[in-house]
Amino acid sequence: MMLRLVTKGLPKVTPSAAKAVLVRGSLLHSFSTSARFNNSVAEDEAKIVLKDKNRPLRIDRELPDPTTERRKRIAGFLLFSVAIGSALSLIFNYEKTESPIISNTLYYIRRSPATKNILGESIEFDGIIPWVYGELNSVKGRINITFYIKGDKNVTGTVRLVADRNTHDEEFLIHEWSVTAAGQKIDLLAENTKTPI
């Protein structure tokens, strides 16, 4: 009976009242945490003491001099330019050596009796890296090339091909197609009825 009377005397706690109490508790906790953080920051700032209060706080370190090692940068740029130029030259030369005009020229040279008499069999490009000098532009109709060949007789020959045309509808007009080796110049136009172009 006494327990029942005490229970009746207590105020009823509604859900909204309980929620309000929880919100107040969380706000008080956040305020206390923020106050402690601000106090710690203030203590850390108080510990910083400037040697010269008239001068601003800065890092006492010399900045790098942009003019130093200028020669190294120039040398590196020159080496880079030479490497790029060499790579482009190799690419363009490879396109020339793989051209059908060069392949047809070598085909007719290998079948030339006069050329085989001087150079021998197995006629190929001379040198470790095949190189075609001059202009080889069939689109614009300009061909003026020179390259070196060699056979199994270890005699080096020079091939020269000069031709041009005015329009795409015309055929190439060959001005010179020859092989020079051992002091002799062989006219391939006189030997062949067909041309490499």
Swiss-Prot record:
Pfam families: Coa1. It is found in: Mitochondrion inner membrane. The keyword Transmembrane helix applies. Keywords: Membrane, Mitochondrion, Mitochondrion inner membrane, Transmembrane, Transmembrane helix. PANTHER family: CYTOCHROME C OXIDASE ASSEMBLY FACTOR 1. Belongs to the COA1 family. This is Cytochrome c oxidase assembly factor 1.
